[in-house]
From Swiss-Prot:
InterPro entries per the UniProt record, alphabetical: Flavodoxin_fold, Flavoprotein-like_sf, FMN-dep_NADH:Q_OxRdtase_AzoR1, NADH:quinone_OxRdtase_FMN_depd
Top enzyme class: oxidoreductase
Coiled coil: none
Family note: Belongs to the azoreductase type 1 family.
Entry protein name: FMN-dependent NADH:quinone oxidoreductase
Lineage: Bacteria, Bacillati, Bacillota, Bacilli, Bacillales
Gene assigned in the entry: azoR
HAMAP family: Azoreductase_type1
Quaternary structure and interacting proteins, as annotated: Homodimer.
Cofactor annotation comment: Binds 1 FMN per subunit.
Keyword set, alphabetical order: Flavoprotein, FMN, NAD, Oxidoreductase
Keyword Flavoprotein: yes
Amino acid sequence: MAKVLYITAHPFNELVSNSMAAGKAFIETYQQQHPDDEVKHIDLFETYIPVIDKDVLTGWGKMSNGETLTDDEQMKVSRLSDILEEFLSADKYVFVTPMWNLSFPPVVKAYIDAISIAGKTFKYSAEGPQGLLTDKKVLHIQSRGGYYTEGPAANFEMGDRYLRTIMTFLGVPSYETIIIEGHNAEPHKTEEIKATSINNAEKLATTF
């Protein structure tokens, strides 16, 4: 039995968002095909994720020195630890994000910062940093209003490229994507684009 974290980063649901519609289709099909697997939904817009700020950095330093943390430091550090442990407990991750300003919503970066911890998800060595998530799988479902997979705007896309890069850095050997794009560039194709992405999601769910 595998544990899947279904991590969504969109303020709207599948009735409004193309990425959320594809994500819903994927996870429903996945659960049908893998009834014994555990799926946990994490809505990043409804989840408290402390940003790494002065309290967090100071708290980590105090922990290393065996010093007492303030209430705010303890609360933030403990919450980040809980997020990390939940992430480590899973076998597969499904990220669902829109493209915002060439990347993804800032809550995704906050989440990535929470789980990118030396000694837990990667380590330093004489040969350089080494990822520790060598038995995990990732799927990223991303919706883009324009066309960024190829063409003149391809080099501007920084969301999926960043997520792929950080997951590779953390040692993840399997990273797949479902890209939904072009519905703003060609509004008359919106329903076709959405239907294709849902079909792709349902197909991938059988083998992920």
